[in-house]
A protein has these predicted regions:
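Ligand-binding clefts of soluble mixed alpha/beta catalytic domains
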Residues: 1-481
């Protein structure tokens, strides 16, 4: 066993007590450049092994910054690659704890080849076993690619640095003005999923592993709960502007684990459990509340480029690991800016494809506006949602009724003596005929109109019914969207 180091302490903080078993403790560096003096390198700067989290097998590696600054050399890379081989054989998650100075210069291309080997192992493991990375120190250059190949990335928020190019190497950037390697910057860029101190990271990794399946052939994790499935949610309608609150209300014991909370805040993604079963949640956000319950930020209920990519990536993960998906839909269109126009079509296409391609149980609850193609892209019935519910106050249709009235009754409105009253009258007629939940239900696009306070009850019943869902799809290697 390696000496007690910070690297080992980080492993022990994540795993169940006394469960860690080290593999490859005797491995040491094999210097491949005879022009540089060889140094002692216990475990070649990385501790590898296995243990359990709440009784579930996981494989862990932790880089030791006290040994050659935790740099990656040939044997260091081989140890991580071998750990992936074990994990793939056993169908168990891999957790990587990063604190690394980068490539080991004295091993030159041998170290570089080691990087490539790890990249390949991670790529093959993607969608087969969950991969989680926690950045505690430096994670620069090629290490940033490694962390981004994982499914979820945690980052220590005071000392850790994550970058492809260091801040002072960026054209026009002054590090004192913009620390592009900081946890805050990378979280807002969507590179990092969770930030916090080391204790928060350890607890977060444990919680996440406990909610996820061990591999793509295992059913979603099931946890014991005493929370009443028929529990009413009287505050649901008031909370829906910030779906993070609404999802907490739906969840067992009010636990919602939000993913990428600092990125594309107008789109909420994360995990809840209902009746102990893990469910991936995607929702449109109109407001973000602070700890005092005051509105901190407001958002238009539209699909944005970043929001679409965020949701697409999350839905793809859920589909890969057979995790059911719940959507809370409140979207009236697409972001309408010149900058957005450069990417919104592709981003929305990817989101649409992700929902349509996902063959896991899918439930959609329409909580507000649901207009046009943006609504269709948000897990609509036509895309394959198994069950669609709507609140009585929801609106479902081509567009906002006021705008529709102005287009459809343009001549009549122009000739009216009271334009505003005529627009309101025609808008009400259009809404009743084309945009009401009753109209959508009559056409089969909504399965039931439900009261907001009964949302948990209906969601629980829906996923229980859909538990054994199976779909037959055409044989293909993969899609190209």
């Amino acid at each position: 066993m390696s000496n007690t180091t910070q690297a080992l302490s980080r492993i022990e903080a994540i795993l169940d007590d006394s469960s860690f078993v080290e593999i490859g403790a005797g491995v040491t560096a094999r210097s491949t450049d005879f022009n540089i003096q060889e140094k002692k390198a216990p475990s070649d700067g990385v501790i590898t092994g296995y243990g359990v989290i709440n009784g579930n097998l996981v494989y862990v590696y932790s880089q030791d910054a006290t040994v050659l600054n935790g740099s990656i050399g040939e044997m260091h890379a081989k140890k991580i690659s071998a750990l992936y081989d074990y994990a793939m054989k056993m169908g168990a998650p891999v957790i990587g704890l990063i604190d690394c100075a980068g490539l080991r210069l004295q091993e030159a291309t041998d170290a570089l080849e080691g990087f490539g080997t790890i990249y390949k192992k991670m790529s093959i493991a993607s969608g087969v076993i969950p991969q989680i990375t926690a950045v505690y120190g430096n994670c620069g250059g090629g290490l940033a690619i490694l962390s981004s190949l994982s499914d979820f990335t945690f980052m220590e928020d005071s000392k850790a640095k994550l970058f492809v190019n260091s801040p002072n190497a960026l054209d026009g950037n002054n590090e004192s003005k913009l620390d592009s390697a900081s946890a805050k910057f990378q979280a807002e860029a969507g590179v990092v999923d969770f930030t916090g101190d080391e204790e928060t990271i350890a607890n977060g990794v444990r919680q996440l592993v406990s909610m996820l399946p061990a591999n793509n052939e295992e059913d979603a994790a099931v946890s014991a709960t005493t929370d009443d499935l028929n529990r009413a949610c009287p505050d649901m309608a008031a909370e829906i502007a910030d779906p993070a609150l609404a999802l907490s209300d739906i969840a067992d014991d009010n636990v919602f684990v939000e993913v990428k909370a600092s990125y594309a805040k107008e789109m909420v993604t994360g995990f809840i459990q209902v009746d102990g079963i893990t469910i991936g949640a995607v929702a449109n956000r109109k407001a973000l509340y602070d700890e005092e319950g005051e509105v901190a930020e407001k958002f238009e209920p539209v699909l944005t480029v970043k929001g679409a990519y965020k949701a697409e990536n999350f839905v793809n993960f859920c589909n890969a690991f057979e995790i059911p998906v719940l959507t809370l839909t409140n979207v009236k269109g697409f972001e309408a800016t010149v900058a957005a126009e450069k990417g919104i079509a592709i981003a929305s296409a990817k989101l649409t494809y992700a929902f349509a391609n996902a063959d896991v149980p899918k439930v959609n609850v329409i909580t507000g506006e649901a207009y046009g193609s943006a609504y269709v892209s948000m897990n609509s019935k036509s895309l394959g949602a198994d069950l669609v519910y709507a609140w009585p106050t929801a609106s479902i249709g081509m567009m906002d009724s006021q705008l529709a009235a102005k287009i459809m009754y343009a001549d009549e409105i122009a000739a009216a003596s009271d334009v505003a009253a005529t627009v309101s009258e025609k808008a009400a007629e259009y809404a009743k005929l084309q945009s009401s939940v009753e109209s959508a239900a009559a056409r089969g696009y909504v399965d039931a109109v439900i009261d907001p306070e009964n949302t948990r009850q209906y969601v629980a019943a829906a996923f229980e019914m859909l538990f054994s869902k199976r779909e037959v799809r055409p044989d293909k290697k993969h899609g190209t969207v």
